[in-house]
C-alpha cells in the first residue's frame, strides 16, 4: 500500500530534487521545549500524521521515522472523531525504496533520497539548541506551496499545545492561509440591471442589421430576431403563460432561438428539453414544472400528447399566422423572475429542475463574454445541447457583444464537426474534451479561440491546440449559471486540471464532509461557490435546495463580517494553488461527468439495481489505461462468494451476461443514453472502506488498469447454450415459446417459467392453437397451473388425449328454430325465410343489450380505416361482403322472445352500405337509429371526400364484437380481397359451450367466493336510482423497470387496484368488476374466433397486510385460474344467488386489462382508429389498461364527473402508477409495507399543510381586551339576568379574589357544578384569573362518575350553585356558592398567568371504565379561537346561543370564543332547552348557534327567524340537514376532538350541493392522514386513514395518565421533516382515532368517514365503546362475548349491545329472537349500567346473536353487526328495547292494540313515525300500529327524539313538553292536545 504526499507544484512541474528548507519557530511550542527527545519525536510524529491526513486524502497514513537505531516505516490510523492524544504510532517495517512513502520525520540525521518532504528536529534536549525545519524537494512542492504546508504544520503544532480535541476539530489554517485565502476571494459585485432578453434588444438599437443567428436552416439579423420573438411572445402572453415555466423541445435552428427569446419576452421562463430523451422522462419534466404549454420545433409535437398541455410548433408558418393576428403583447419580468429552468440528473431517479433567475444569468453571461473576449466580429459555433447551461452563455454572451451565433444541424454537429466549423467560419467554440480530441488545428483555420469544459482535458490535446489558438479551460455547474472558473491562455505544457480563478466574487474550499471547516491551501476539499450568479434553487425541492445552497458558515466572519450571501456546494473536490487558482481533484460522492454531461451516479445506480434485481451495484466513471472515461457498473457476480484474497474483478459467466443483457433493455427506456453504463464489471466481492462504504477508489484503480476494450469485453455476449430440454416434446414447446416471445432458443430451458420469460394471459391464449398444430393439446388453464416448461409438457402427457372441445351442435334444436322463426322475423322486420339460425344469448350479450337500452349509444364501437389510393373500393366492398357472409356473428341481431328470453338470430342479408360526408354524421346516425332489439348490430359506411383518402367506417355493437376480434376481422378481409378463401366461423359453438356449463356448479362457486362479502361501493352513487354517465377521461403511461416475474400484468394490476380500493374505501374486503377475455374456454379455434367472448365478473380481493406481494399475486393468479370455468355465468345471474352476491355485483369500478391493440397496419387498409370513448362504458369509473410491453402500460380512466371529480381521478392514476412500480420492483415486500404515497400526493400535501404560529395570549386577557374596548356592550344575556363586559369583568375578578383566598393556586383544577346560568361565564373567567383551570360538570351524571372526576383532579374547591349544593357536598369538602359571592369584597392581587398554563380540563369517556381529563392550555385555545373566529363569522354583533350540555366541550366554545370575539353569549335555562327552545332563542334574539345534527333534525327553520348562522358539529350529518337549513341560514360544519381545543377543522359554507361528510380545512393546525394501523406511515391522498392533528391547538395530554397520553399524543413522525426542511419539527401530534379522507375537490378539505377504534359520538356526546363494554361485561357475567356499537335502523342513531351465550361457529351471523328469560335478565342488567354511566352511554337495543363475526384480519366485523339492524323497522327492533328504569313508572305494554284509535291518537302515531324514521308525513308506506299503552322510549325514542316530537306536535296543537314524552304513555300524550 502506498501513501504519498501529493505533488503541489502549482501546475509547473520541475525536475529539481535538491533539498530546500523552511525554518519553523520552535519557541511557540512548549511541548517541543523542556522535554525529552523521545517526547519531542512523539509530538512531531502526531503532528505529521495529522498533516498527511489533511493532504493525502487517506485515513491510514505512513511515513518514514528516524530514531536512534535508524530509519523505519511507521503507520498511524487517523480519523476525524479520534482525539489527537489517542493516535497510536505503529511500526510498519524497514524504510526502503519499495515502502511506498515519500515523507518523514527525522532527528537531524541523513535524509534518505526517497523522502521528498521531511520534518526535521535538530539539536539536543536543551531548549536553546533545538531547531525545527521542513525540508522539501522542489519537484514535490513549489516555494509557495512549501510555505503553505509549513504554515499548516505550525497551526497543527499550535493546536497540540491545547486541549485533547478530536482531529476533526483542529484548526489547520495558519495566519498565512487566512491572509492568502482572503486575497483570493474579493468582495462581491452588484448584479446587472435588466433582464436577459434585454441583451438582444440592446443590440437591435446598435447592430440591428448585423447577423445575430446563422443556422443551417436560415439567418436572422438582430432586428429580425427581435421582431419574430416579439410576435410570438404576444401569442404566448395571450395563452396566459406569464410567470410559468414553458418547456422548449427543439433541435438547433433559428426558430429555437426565436422561441427562447419569445418565452422570456412573454414573462415566462424557458425550460429546454432534449428530444432524444425517453418520452416518459420528458412527460415527467413537463408535469413537474406544471407547464400549460410546450414549444417545439417541427417533428416533436407528438412527444407531448398530454391532457391540459398545449403544444405550440414554432415554424415560419406559425409565425406568419401569429403575425396576422396582430397580437404584440409583451410582459417585462421583474428582477427576481425566473428566466430558465434547466434539468440535471437527480439522486432519486427523477431529474431535478434548477431555476435560474434573470439577474444571475445576466451577471454570469456578461462576465463570460468579457473573459472570452467576444466582439462584434465573433462567430460562435454553438455546439452544446440547449439543455446544457453553457449553451446560454454561448447564445446570449455572443449576442451581448453583437457577435453571430452559428447553429449547425444535428447531423453536422455529430458527423462532420470540422466541416461545420469551416462552413460557418467559426472563430470561437465551447467544446468538451472528447469532441476536441476528434479535431486537428489544420481542419479549422478560422478557429481563433476554444474553451473546453465538462470533463478532464488530456495533456496531448493541450499540447496540440495551445500553440495554435487561445485555449481556455472553464468550470461551472448548472447551479452557477454554467460557469464560475476560467483558466485562459493555456500553454502547450500547462496543467489542464487547473480550472482557473474565480472571476466573479469567490470560491472557497472546505472539508469534503463539512462545509463549516476551511481546509489549508493545497489540501483537497469541496468547492463552495459564492456570488450573484447562483441559481434560485431546485424546483419544488426545498430540502435539496437547503442542502446545496447554504447560508454563510461561521468562518465567513473571518473574511467578511456580516456577509449574508448564499454559497453553493458543488460536490467537486479541488485544491488551491498558491496563486489562488484552483486545481480539480475529483467528484465528491455520487456526481460525475461523462462526455461533458453531468450525471448523478446515485440515480444511475438506482435504475441499474432495479433492472438487475440486485442491491450490490456501484456505478462510477473509470479512467482507463488508454485514457478514456468509461461509465462503469460494478456488480457482484452471481454464485458462491469467492475467497477474500482472490482477484476482485472476474470474467463474466453466462448468468451475469444474461442479467446485463436484460438490464440494458430496461435502461434504454428509462435513462438517456449518456447515463447508461457502457461497461459492466463482475466482482468477486464488494470492497469496503474502514467506514463500511463501497471503496470506489479501489474499484476505479483496478478497472483503470484495463483498456476500454478490455472493460467492455468482460460482460460481452458470449452465451453458452442453456440447459437442453430432455425430450422431443420439450424441444417443441421450447421452439413455440421462442417464436411467441421472440427469445433465442438458448435462453429457454425446461425449468423456465412461462411468465418469468415475459408471457401473459394473451400469449397463453395464442400458445394453445400453436401447440395443437404440433400435437400438444393444452388449455390456457394448463399454462397457469403449470407455468414451467418441463412441468407443462409433463402435465400434457399425464392428461392423455384431449377431451372433446368442439361444440358444433346448435344449442337450440332445429325444430325449435323453425317454430321461433316467425316471431324472430317479425321483431327483425324480415321474412321468416331470411332467418338462418336462432340460439340463446350469452349472459354478456344480454347484459350489454340491457345497458344499451338504458343509455342510447352505449357500447357501440366505431372504427375508421383509411383506404389507400391504390385499393379498388368496389373490390374492397365485395371483400367485406364475403367476410360478412362467412361470419354469421356480423349478421346477428338480438331479440327477446316471450317465455324463453333473449336469443340471437342470424339473418341472411347483404351489407347495407351507407354513404356519408363525415364521421360525425355516421355516429349521429347510429345514435338516432339506435342499435336495439331486432336491429342491425354491424353497420358499414363509406366516406369519400374530394381531397382526402377515402375511409371505411364500421359501427358494431359490443354484444357481437370485442377488441380481440378487430385484428382478426381485418386479416379475413385482407384474405378476401386477395381472392383467398375465407373459412366459415360459427359463434354458436361458443354459445353451446357456455350453455353446457352446469349453472348449479357456477352458482355454488360464486356463492362460496362471495360468502360474507361486505364491499364498499367506489365511487359512490349520488343516489340509488342514479345511472352513471361516464363522459370524461384521463390517461397516463406507466413505465416500469424491466422485471422478470412469474406473475402476469393482469394479476399485478388487479392487486394494485385492490390495494388502492382498500385504502380509498377503508375496507379490506374489496370487490370490483374485472373483464376477462373469455379466450381460455376449451373451444376449438377460440383464439381466432370473431365474436364477443368477454366476461365481466365480480372480483373479490381480501387484503391481508402481512402477506408478501408475491404471495398476494400468487393467490390472485390462483383465484383467476379457478374462476375461468365460471366466468361466463354473467352478472345478471350471479346477482340472483343471494344478498351477498347482489352486494358484490353492485360495484362501480371496472378494470379491463388487454394487450396492445393498435391494429395491424395492413396493406389493404391504413391504421385502424378505434379511440375508446367514455360512452362505451356504464360504470362510474372504468380503468382500461393496455399492456404495451413488459415494462409499459397505458392507463386510461373513463369516469362520471358527478360521481368522481377529475382531480381525484388524476390522484388515482398517479397512485396506481406508483403502486405498479413498487409491486413490480419489491415482490418480497409485505403489502402493509408498500408505500402508496405518490410524488403527486407529496406535492399536494406540502401545499395543504403549512406551519401555524401559536397565539401567545391568555384567554381571559383576550376577553378583558373586549371589556376595555366595549365595556357597556352586552356580554351575557341569560334567563336569569344580563351582564355587560364591564360587569362580567368586575364580578369575575371579585370571584377570582375569593378563589385565590380559598387556596386556588396556579395550575389548580376547579370543578364548576352549575345549571345553565349567567354565573357560568363568571365562574369560568374567575378561575382563569385566579391562575386555575376550570372543569365544567354536568349535574345529570351519576354521582359515582362525578366523584371519579373530582378525585382525579384533587380539586381544592368546587364552585356550585345553591341548586346543586347537596350534590357538590358529595364531591368536595370545600364549596363556594356563586350566589353567596361577596360583591363588596376587595379585589386582591392575583397571580400571573402564562399562555402555557392550563385554561380548562374536559373529561371524556375512557376505555378502562374511568373518564379521562383532557388539559388545554391558554395558548392552544387562543390559537384555535383566532383561527376559526373570522371564517365562522363570529363578530362583535354575534349573539351566540349557549345550548350544549356542560359535558360537551362545545359549551366551552359557545362561551369563550364568543366572548373573545366581543359577541354576546345567550344562555337558556335547562327547561327552555328541552321544552321551548324556539321561544327562548327568540327571547334572547340569538343569531348564531353551534348544534349537533341530532338536535337540528328536531327543529324547523321557520321557528327560528332570528338565526343567521348555524354551525353543525359533534357528529356526522346527512344531506337532509343541508337541504332543510342552507336556504335559511349561513350553514357551516365543524369538527374537533376535545384534545385539540374543541375545533380543528371548519367548512365555512354549506350549500345544497355540498357533501355532508365534508368537515372542511384545518384551522390553527395541520391535518395529516396516516395509515389507520401505523401513524408513522402517511396515507395516500384520497384514501381513508386516521387523522393526525399537528399544531399549537393540540392539548397538553390526559391528567395524571401518562400511558394514555403517550398513546394518543405521540412524537411527530419522521416524515413530517420532509415537508418542513429547515424548520423545527413539532414535538407531538395528536392521534384522533377518526378515519377521514381528502375531499375529491382536492383542496385539502376532509371527509369524515368513521371512528377507527371503539370511540364514537352519539347525539354529539363522545363515548368510548370499550368503556360501555367494560361495564356491560361486569354486569353480564354470564355472557361470553359482548360488542357495543352505534347502529342506525331506519336512519335513527341508537346504541346497541350485541351478545351471545352459546356461540354457533358454523351458523351465519344473525339476530336471535328475544326470549322472556333474556328480557328479565337484561332488565336487571340495565339499572347496573345506569348507576355507573351517563344515560347516553346506556344501550337502547340489546340484541342476542348466533355469533360475533370476524373480519379476514380476525377482528370484530362491526360492519356486519351494524348491517343486521340497519334495515329493521321500529316494529321489528322494538322487541330488543330494554326500557330505562327511570321510565318504569308505567307498566310495560303487553302488546295489546285498541281496536279503534281516536283522531288525536292517529295524528300522534303519524308524528311518532316521522320522528323515528325521518319520513315525510305524505309517505304512502303503511306502518304497523303502535300500542297507546307504550312508553316512547320503549319503541326506540330518546331525549332528542322527545325534543323533536315536542316540536312537531306543538305545530299540531299538542301541549306536552319533552319531559312528558319521556314519562307518559302515548295514550296520555294523545290527550294533551288543544282543540
UniProtKB/Swiss-Prot annotation:
Disruption phenotype: Abolishes the production of ochratoxin A and accumulates the intermediate ochratoxin beta. The keyword DNA repair does not apply. Residues 1264-1659 are annotated as: Adenylation 2. It catalyses: 7-carboxymellein + L-phenylalanine + ATP = ochratoxin B + ADP + phosphate + H(+). Keywords: Ligase, Phosphopantetheine, Phosphoprotein, Repeat, Virulence. Its EC number is 6.3.2.-. Residues 202-590 are annotated as: Adenylation 1. Residues 836-1245 are annotated as: Condensation. One of its GO terms (molecular function) is ligase activity. Stilbenes such as resveratrol, piceatannol and pterostilbene affect the expression of the OTA cluster to reduce ochratoxin A and B production and thus could be used as naturally safe and efficient compounds in food active packaging or preservatives against ochratoxin A in food. Pterostilbene with methoxy groups demonstrated greater inhibitory and antitoxic activity than resveratrol and piceatannol. SUPFAM superfamilies: Acetyl-CoA synthetase-like (SSF56801), ACP-like (SSF47336), CoA-dependent acyltransferases (SSF52777). The keyword Phosphoprotein applies. GO terms for biological process: amino acid activation for nonribosomal peptide biosynthetic process; ochratoxin A biosynthetic process. NRP synthetases are composed of discrete domains (adenylation (A), thiolation (T) or peptidyl carrier protein (PCP) and condensation (C) domains) which when grouped together are referred to as a single module. Each module is responsible for the recognition (via the A domain) and incorporation of a single amino acid into the growing peptide product. Thus, an NRP synthetase is generally composed of one or more modules and can terminate in a thioesterase domain (TE) that releases the newly synthesized peptide from the enzyme. Belongs to the NRP synthetase family. This is Nonribosomal peptide synthetase otaB. The lineage of its organism: Eukaryota, Fungi, Dikarya, Ascomycota, Pezizomycotina. The gene is otaB.
Amino acid at each position: 500500500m502506498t501513501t504519498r504526499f501529493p505533488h503541489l507544484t502549482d501546475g509547473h512541474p520541475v525536475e529539481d530534487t535538491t533539498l530546500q528548507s523552511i525554518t519553523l519557530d520552535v519557541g511557540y511550542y512548549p511541548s517541543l521545549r523542556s522535554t525529552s527527545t523521545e517526547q519531542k519525536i512523539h509530538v512531531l510524529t502526531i503532528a505529521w500524521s495529522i498533516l498527511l491526513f489533511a493532504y493525502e486524502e487517506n485515513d491510514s497514513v505512513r511515513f518514514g521515522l528516524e530514531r536512534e537505531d535508524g530509519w523505519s516505516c511507521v503507520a498511524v490510523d487517523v480519523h476525524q472523531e479520534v482525539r489527537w492524544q489517542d493516535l497510536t504510532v505503529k511500526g510498519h517495517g524497514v524504510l526502503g525504496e519499495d515502502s511506498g512513502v515519500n515523507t518523514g520525520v527525522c532527528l537531524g540525521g541523513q535524509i534518505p533520497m526517497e523522502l521528498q518532504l521531511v520534518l526535521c528536529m535538530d539539536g539536543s534536549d536543551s531548549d536553546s539548541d533545538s531547531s525545527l525545519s521542513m525540508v522539501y524537494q522542489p519537484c514535490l512542492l513549489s516555494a509557495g506551496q512549501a510555505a503553505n504546508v509549513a504554515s499548516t504544520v505550525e497551526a497543527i503544532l499550535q493546536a497540540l499545545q491545547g486541549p485533547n480535541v478530536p482531529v476533526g476539530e483542529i484548526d489547520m489554517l495558519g495566519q498565512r492561509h487566512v491572509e492568502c485565502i482572503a486575497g483570493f476571494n474579493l468582495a462581491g459585485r452588484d448584479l446587472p440591471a435588466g433582464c436577459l432578453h434585454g441583451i438582444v434588444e440592446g443590440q437591435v438599437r446598435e447592430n440591428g442589421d448585423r447577423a445575430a443567428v446563422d443556422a443551417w436552416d436560415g439567418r436572422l439579423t438582430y432586428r429580425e430576431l427581435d421582431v419574430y420573438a416579439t410576435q410570438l411572445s404576444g401569442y404566448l402572453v395571450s395563452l396566459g403563460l406569464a410567470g410559468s415555466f414553458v418547456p422548449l423541445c427543439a433541435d438547433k435552428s433559428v426558430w429555437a432561438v426565436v422561441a427562447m427569446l419569445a418565452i422570456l419576452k412573454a414573462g415566462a421562463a424557458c425550460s429546454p428539453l432534449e428530444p432524444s430523451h425517453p418520452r416518459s422522462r420528458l412527460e415527467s419534466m413537463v408535469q413537474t414544472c406544471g407547464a400549460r404549454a410546450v414549444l417545439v420545433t417541427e417533428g416533436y409535437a407528438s412527444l407531448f400528447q398530454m391532457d391540459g398541455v398545449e403544444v405550440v410548433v414554432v415554424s415560419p408558418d406559425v409565425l406568419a399566422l401569429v403575425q396576422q393576428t396582430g397580437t404584440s403583447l409583451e410582459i417585462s419580468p421583474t428582477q427576481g423572475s425566473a428566466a430558465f429552468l434547466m434539468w440535471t440528473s437527480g439522486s432519486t431517479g427523477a431529474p431535478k429542475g434548477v431555476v435560474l433567475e434573470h439577474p444571475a444569468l445576466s451577471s454570469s453571461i456578461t462576465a463570460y463574454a468579457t473573459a472570452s473576449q467576444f466582439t462584434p466580429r465573433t462567430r460562435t459555433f454553438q455546439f452544446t445541447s440547449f439543455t446544457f447551461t453553457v449553451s446560454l452563455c454561448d447564445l446570449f454572451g455572443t449576442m451581448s457583444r453583437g457577435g453571430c451565433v452559428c447553429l449547425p444541424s444535428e447531423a453536422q454537429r455529430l458527423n462532420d464537426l470540422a466541416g461545420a466549423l469551416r462552413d460557418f467560419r467559426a472563430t470561437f467554440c465551447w467544446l468538451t474534451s472528447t469532441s476536441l480530441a476528434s479535431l486537428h488545428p489544420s481542419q479549422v483555420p478560422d478557429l481563433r479561440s476554444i474553451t473546453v469544459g465538462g470533463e478532464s482535458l488530456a495533456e496531448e490535446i493541450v499540447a496540440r491546440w495551445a500553440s495554435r489558438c487561445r485555449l481556455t479551460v472553464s468550470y461551472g455547474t448548472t447551479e452557477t449559471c454554467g460557469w464560475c472558473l476560467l483558466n485562459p491562455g493555456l500553454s502547450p505544457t500547462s496543467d489542464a486540471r487547473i480550472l482557473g480563478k474565480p472571476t466573479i466574487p469567490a470560491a472557497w474550499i472546505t472539508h469534503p464532509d463539512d462545509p463549516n471547516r476551511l481546509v489549508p491551501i493545497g489540501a483537497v476539499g469541496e468547492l463552495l461557490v459564492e456570488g450573484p450568479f447562483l441559481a434560485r434553487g431546485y424546483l419544488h425541492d426545498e430540502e435539496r435546495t437547503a442542502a446545496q445552497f447554504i447560508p454563510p458558515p461561521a468562518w465567513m466572519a473571518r473574511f467578511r463580517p456580516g456577509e449574508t450571501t448564499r454559497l453553493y456546494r458543488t460536490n467537486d473536490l479541488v485544491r488551491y494553488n498558491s496563486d489562488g487558482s484552483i486545481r480539480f481533484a475529483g467528484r465528491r460522492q455520487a456526481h460525475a461527468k461523462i462526455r461533458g454531461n453531468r450525471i448523478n451516479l446515485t440515480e444511475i445506480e438506482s435504475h441499474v439495481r432495479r433492472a438487475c434485481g440486485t442491491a450490490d451495484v456501484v456505478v462510477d466513471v473509470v479512467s482507463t489505461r488508454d485514457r478514456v472515461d468509461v461509465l462503469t457498473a460494478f456488480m457482484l457476480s452471481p454464485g458462491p462468494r469467492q475467497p477474500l484474497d482472490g482477484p476482485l474483478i472476474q470474467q463474466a459467466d453466462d448468468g451475469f451476461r444474461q442479467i446485463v443483457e436484460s438490464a440494458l433493455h430496461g435502461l434504454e427506456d428509462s435513462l438517456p443514453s449518456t447515463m447508461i453504463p457502457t461497461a459492466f464489471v463482475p466482482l468477486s466481492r464488494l470492497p469496503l472502506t474502514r467506514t463500511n462504504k463501497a471503496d470506489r477508489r479501489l474499484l476505479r484503480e483496478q478497472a483503470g488498469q484495463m483498456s476500454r476494450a478490455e472493460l467492455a469485453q468482460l460482460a460481452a455476449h458470449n452465451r453458452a447454450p442453456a440447459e437442453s430440454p430432455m425430450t422431443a416434446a420439450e424441444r417443441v414447446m421450447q421452439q413455440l415459446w421462442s417464436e411467441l416471445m421472440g427469445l433465442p432458443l438458448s435462453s429457454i430451458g425446461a425449468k423456465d417459467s412461462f411468465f418469468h420469460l415475459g408471457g401473459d394471459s394473451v400469449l397463453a391464449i395464442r400458445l394453445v392453437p400453436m401447440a395443437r398444430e404440433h400435437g400438444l393439446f393444452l388449455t390456457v388453464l394448463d399454462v397457469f397451473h403449470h407455468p414451467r416448461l418441463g412441468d407443462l409438457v409433463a402435465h400434457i402427457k399425464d392428461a392423455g388425449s384431449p377431451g372433446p372441445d368442439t361444440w358444433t351442435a346448435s344449442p337450440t334444436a332445429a325444430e325449435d328454430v323453425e317454430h321461433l322463426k316467425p316471431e324472430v322475423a317479425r321483431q327483425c322486420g324480415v321474412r321468416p325465410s331470411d332467418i338462418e339460425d336462432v340460439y340463446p344469448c350469452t349472459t354478456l350479450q344480454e347484459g350489454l343489450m340491457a345497458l344499451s337500452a338504458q343509455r342510447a349509444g352505449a357500447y357501440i364501437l366505431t372504427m375508421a380505416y383509411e383506404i389507400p389510393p391504390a385499393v379498388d373500393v368496389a373490390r374492397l366492398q365485395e371483400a367485406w361482403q364475403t367476410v360478412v357472409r362467412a361470419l354469421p356473428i356480423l349478421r346477428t341481431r338480438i331479440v327477446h322472445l316471450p317465455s324463453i328470453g333473449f336469443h340471437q338470430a342470424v339473418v341472411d342479408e347483404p351489407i347495407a352500405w351507407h354513404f356519408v360526408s363525415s364521421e360525425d354524421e355516421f355516429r349521429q346516425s347510429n345514435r338516432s337509429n339506435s342499435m336495439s332489439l331486432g336491429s342491425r348490430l354491424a353497420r358499414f359506411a363509406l366516406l369519400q371526400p374530394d381531397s382526402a383518402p377515402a375511409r371505411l367506417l364500421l359501427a358494431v355493437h359490443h354484444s357481437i364484437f370485442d377488441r380481440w376480434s378487430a385484428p382478426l376481422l381485418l386479416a379475413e378481409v385482407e384474405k378476401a380481397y386477395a381472392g383467398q378463401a375465407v373459412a366459415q366461423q360459427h359463434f354458436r359453438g361458443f354459445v353451446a359451450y357456455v350453455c353446457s356449463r352446469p349453472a348449479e356448479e357456477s352458482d355454488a362457486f360464486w356463492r362460496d367466493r362471495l360468502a360474507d362479502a361486505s364491499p364498499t361501493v367506489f365511487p359512490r352513487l349520488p343516489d340509488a336510482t342514479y345511472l352513471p354517465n361516464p363522459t370524461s377521461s384521463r390517461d397516463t403511461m406507466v413505465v416500469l423497470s424491466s422485471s422478470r416475474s412469474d406473475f402476469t400484468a393482469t394479476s399485478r394490476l388487479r392487486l394494485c387496484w385492490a390495494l388502492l380500493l382498500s385504502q380509498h374505501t377503508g375496507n379490506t374486503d374489496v370487490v370490483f368488476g374485472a373483464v376477462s377475455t373469455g379466450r381460455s374456454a376449451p373451444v376449438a379455434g377460440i383464439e381466432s374466433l370473431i365474436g364477443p367472448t368477454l366476461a365481466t365478473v365480480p372480483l373479490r380481493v381480501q387484503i391481508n397486510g402481512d402477506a408478501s406481494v408475491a404471495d398476494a399475486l400468487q393467490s390472485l393468479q390462483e383465484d383467476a385460474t379457478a374462476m375461468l370455468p365460471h366466468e361466463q355465468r354473467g352478472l345478471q345471474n350471479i346477482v340472483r344467488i343471494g344478498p351477498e352476491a347482489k352486494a358484490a355485483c353492485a360495484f362501480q369500478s371496472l378494470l379491463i386489462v388487454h394487450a396492445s391493440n393498435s391494429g395491424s397496419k395492413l396493406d389493404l387498409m391504413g391504421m385502424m382508429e378505434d379511440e375508446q370513448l367514455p360512452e362505451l362504458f356504464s360504470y362510474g369509473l372504468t380503468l382500461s389498461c393496455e399492456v404495451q410491453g413488459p415494462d409499459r402500460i397505458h392507463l386510461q380512466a373513463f369516469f362520471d364527473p358527478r360521481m368522481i371529480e377529475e382531480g381525484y381521478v388524476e390522484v388515482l392514476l398517479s397512485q396506481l402508477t406508483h403502486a405498479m412500480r413498487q409491486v413490480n420492483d419489491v415482490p418480497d415486500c409485505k403489502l402493509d409495507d408498500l408505500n402508496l404515497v405518490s410524488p403527486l400526493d407529496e406535492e399536494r400535501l406540502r401545499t395543504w399543510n403549512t406551519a401555524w404560529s401559536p397565539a401567545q395570549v391568555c384567554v381571559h386577557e383576550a376577553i378583558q381586551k373586549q371589556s376595555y374596548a366595549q365595556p357597556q356592550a352586552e356580554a351575557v344575556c341569560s334567563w336569569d339576568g344580563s351582564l355587560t363586559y364591564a360587569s362580567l369583568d368586575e364580578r369575575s375578578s371579585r370571584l377570582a379574589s375569593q378563589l385565590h383566598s380559598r387556596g386556588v393556586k396556579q395550575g389548580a383544577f376547579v370543578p364548576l357544578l352549575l345549571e345553565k346560568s349567567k354565573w357560568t361565564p363568571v365562574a369560568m373567567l374567575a378561575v382563569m384569573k385566579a391562575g386555575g383551570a376550570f372543569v365544567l360538570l354536568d349535574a345529570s351524571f351519576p354521582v359515582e362518575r362525578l366523584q371519579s372526576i373530582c378525585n382525579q383532579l384533587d380539586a381544592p374547591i368546587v364552585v356550585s350553585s345553591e341548586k346543586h349544593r347537596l350534590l357538590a357536598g358529595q364531591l368536595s369538602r370545600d364549596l363556594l356558592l356563586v350566589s353567596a359571592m361577596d360583591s363588596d369584597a376587595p379585589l386582591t392581587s392575583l397571580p400571573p398567568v402564562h399562555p402555557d398554563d392550563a385554561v380548562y380540563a374536559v373529561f371524556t369517556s375512557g376505555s378502562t371504565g374511568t373518564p379521562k381529563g383532557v388539559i388545554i392550555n391558554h395558548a392552544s385555545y387562543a390559537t384555535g379561537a383566532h383561527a376559526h373566529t373570522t371564517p365562522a363569522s363570529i363578530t362583535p354583533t354575534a349573539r351566540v346561543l349557549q345550548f350544549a350540555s356542560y359535558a360537551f366541550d362545545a359549551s366551552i366554545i359557545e362561551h369563550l370564543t364568543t366572548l373573545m370575539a366581543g359577541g354576546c353569549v345567550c344562555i337558556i335555562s335547562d327547561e327552555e332547552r328541552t321544552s321551548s327552545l324556539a321561544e327562548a332563542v327568540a327571547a334572547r334574539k340569538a343569531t348564531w348557534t353551534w348544534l349537533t345534527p341530532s338536535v337540528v333534525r328536531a327543529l324547523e327553520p321557520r321557528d327560528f327567524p332570528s338565526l343567521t348562522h348555524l354551525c353543525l358539529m359533534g357528529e356526522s350529518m346527512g344531506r337532509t340537514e343541508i337541504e332543510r337549513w342552507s336556504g335559511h341560514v349561513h350553514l357551516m360544519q365543524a369538527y374537533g376532538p376535545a384534545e385539540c381545543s374543541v375545533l380543528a377543522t371548519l367548512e365555512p359554507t354549506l350549500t345544497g350541493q355540498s357533501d355532508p361528510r365534508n368537515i372542511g380545512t384545518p384551522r390553527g393546525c395541520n391535518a395529516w392522514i396516516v395509515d389507520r394501523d401505523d401513524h408513522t406511515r402517511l396515507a395516500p391522498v384520497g384514501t381513508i386513514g386516521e387523522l393526525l392533528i399537528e399544531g399549537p391547538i393540540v392539548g397538553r395530554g390526559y391528567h395524571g395518565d401518562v400511558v394514555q397520553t403517550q398513546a394518543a399524543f405521540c412524537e411527530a413522525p419522521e416524515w413530517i421533516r420532509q415537508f418542513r426542511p429547515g424548520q423545527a419539527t413539532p414535538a407531538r401530534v395528536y392521534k384522533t382515532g377518526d378515519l377521514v379522507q381528502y375531499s375529491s375537490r382536492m383542496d385539502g378539505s376532509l371527509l369524515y368517514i368513521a371512528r377507527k377504534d371503539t370511540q364514537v359520538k352519539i347525539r354529539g356526546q363522545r363515548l368510548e365503546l370499550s368503556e360501555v363494554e367494560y361495564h356491560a361485561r361486569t354486569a353480564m357475567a354470564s355472557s361470553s362475548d359482548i360488542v357495543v356499537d352505534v347502529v342506525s335502523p331506519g336512519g335513527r342513531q341508537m346504541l346497541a349491545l350485541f351478545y351471545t351465550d352459546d356461540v354457533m361457529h358454523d351458523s351465519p351471523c344473525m339476530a336471535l329472537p328475544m326470549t322472556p328469560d333474556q328480557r328479565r335478565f337484561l332488565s336487571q342488567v340495565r339499572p347496573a349500567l345506569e348507576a355507573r354511566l351517563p344515560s347516553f352511554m346506556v344501550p337502547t337495543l340489546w340484541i342476542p346473536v348466533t355469533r360475533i363475526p370476524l373480519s379476514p384480519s380476525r377482528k370484530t366485523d362491526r360492519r356486519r353487526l351494524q348491517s343486521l339492524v340497519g334495515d329493521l323497522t321500529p316494529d321489528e327492533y322494538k322487541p330488543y328495547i330494554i326500557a330505562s328504569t327511570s321510565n318504569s313508572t308505567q307498566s310495560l305494554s303487553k302488546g295489546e292494540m285498541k281496536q279503534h284509535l281516536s283522531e288525536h291518537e292517529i295524528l300522534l302515531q303519524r308524528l311518532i313515525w316521522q320522528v323515528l324514521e325521518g319520513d315525510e308525513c305524505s309517505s304512502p308506506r303503511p306502518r304497523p300500529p303502535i300500542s297507546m299503552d307504550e312508553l316512547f322510549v320503549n319503541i326506540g325514542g330518546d331525549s332528542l327524539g322527545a325534543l323533536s316530537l315536542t316540536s312537531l306536535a306543538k305545530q299540531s296543537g299538542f301541549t306536552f313538553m319533552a319531559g312528558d314524552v319521556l314519562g307518559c304513555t302515548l295514550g296520555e300524550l294523545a290527550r294533551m292536545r288543544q282543540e
